[in-house]
């Protein structure tokens, strides 16, 4: 699926997340107006109802130290220990990704990500270097998969034949090598609490399923929107101005992340529904706007929630048309209606979690009760 060729041709990059972040840190270290202190924050310092700084401990140090600031930016990731002080989180664990590395192989589309769907858990494959590919396999449930010799056998039996032929030997080698990584997949709608002197952003505030790789796009959106608000403040000791900037960020950040969130969790629901999974594949296989506009939302290039909703419903409708035309109409009418109902059931709660306007909220709540 190509990126939309508008206003110049955009391109995507596959990379190791850890290496990418380390390179960002290297760049930060070169900036003269930034002082870097490495340590572990232990507490937020509170005076009355205002956060005025942090207590932290340097590596190998015995004693804690304190830092004070007019604004503390909390970005301690998916396992945030300060989340509950700055939001009302409703965190849902969807399952786990198992990661392994394919070496020295080719995939059907060089320099592209691949989503492998079928009668097995979904797999995501994307390049991380010129000679290696990261494979992520989804495992539902509240507990991570149990690793061991039997697990290797299970992986080969369940997924080897689902891999593209050109990558099967590399997949077998990666399984036998056994260098697996597991990490949890969360869904966490943003529900911040305004606290004077602090702001929460990134995965600490809001998470979606990583199936579409939208976490970094959402984090950069948070950074950009918060920065744009803060750069207008001349004096950070003016707590009223500072509070307004943070409040505006909380009120508008969803405009940059809502399509990323809805598509990620919506597609995760689709890939586990056999009828919708087939409908999605056939829909984007039509090419043209059916593929390009969908990809533009996936890549974070298009943030039009209405466009996303239109494509989602059109995909379900197209699936029903294919099912009815392929078989006797009387046999599949019930299944077709069920497909549309399933699609509405997937998308409605996601739309409700992204600050709909009052009129749409009433309609969505009514739909949610029906499905």
Region annotations inferred by a language model:
Residues 1-85, 91-99:
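Conserved N-terminal helical subregion
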Residues 40-41, 78, 121, 131, ...:
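A generic "binding-loop/recognition-motif" signal
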Residues 84-86, 96-126, 147, 166-175, ...:
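Flavin-dependent oxidoreductases
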Residues 143-250:
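FAD/FMN-dependent oxidoreductases across multiple families
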Residues 228-371:
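C-terminal helical "tail/cap" subdomain of flavin- and related membrane-associated enzymes
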């Amino acid at each position: 699926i190509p990126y939309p060729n508008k206003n110049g041709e955009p391109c995507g990059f596959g990379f190791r997340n850890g290496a990418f972040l380390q390179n960002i840190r290297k760049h930060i270290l070169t900036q003269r107006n930034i002082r870097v202190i490495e340590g572990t924050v232990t507490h937020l310092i509170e005076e009355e109802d205002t956060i005025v700084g942090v207590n932290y401990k340097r590596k190998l140090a015995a004693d804690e130290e304190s830092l004070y600031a007019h604004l503390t930016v909390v970005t301690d990731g998916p396992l945030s220990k300060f989340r509950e002080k700055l939001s009302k989180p409703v965190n849902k664990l969807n399952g786990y990704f198992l990661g392994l590395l394919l070496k020295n192989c080719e995939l059907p589309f060089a320099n592209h990500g691949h989503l492998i769907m079928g009668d097995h858990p979904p797999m995501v494959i994307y390049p991380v270097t010129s000679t290696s590919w990261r494979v992520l396999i989804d495992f539902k449930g509240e507990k991570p998969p149990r690793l061991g010799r039997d697990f290797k056998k299970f992986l080969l039996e369940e997924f080897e034949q689902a891999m593209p032929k050109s990558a099967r030997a590399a997949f077998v080698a990666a399984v036998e090598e056994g260098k697996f990584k597991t990490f949890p997949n969360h869904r966490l709608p943003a529900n911040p609490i305004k606290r004077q002197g602090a702001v929460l952003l990134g995965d600490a505030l809001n998470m979606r399923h990583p199936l579409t790789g939208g976490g970094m796009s959402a984090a950069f959106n948070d950074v950009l929107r918060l920065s744009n608000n803060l750069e207008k403040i001349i004096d950070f000791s003016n707590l009223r101005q500072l509070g307004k900037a943070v409040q505006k960020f909380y009120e508008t950040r969803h405009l940059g992340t809502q399509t990323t969130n809805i598509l990620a969790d919506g597609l995760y629901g689709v890939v586990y529904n056999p009828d919708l999974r087939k409908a999605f594949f056939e829909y984007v296989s039509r090419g043209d706007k059916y593929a390009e506009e969908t990809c533009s939302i996936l890549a974070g290039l298009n943030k039009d929630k209405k466009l996303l909703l239109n494509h989602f419903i059109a995909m379900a409708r197209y699936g029903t048309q294919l099912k009815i035309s392929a078989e006797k109409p009387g046999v599949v009418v019930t299944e077709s209606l069920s497909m549309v109902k399933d699609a509405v059931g997937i998308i409605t709660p996601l739309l409700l979690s992204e600050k709909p306007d009052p009129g749409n909220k009433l309609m969505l709540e009514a739909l949610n009760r029906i499905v």
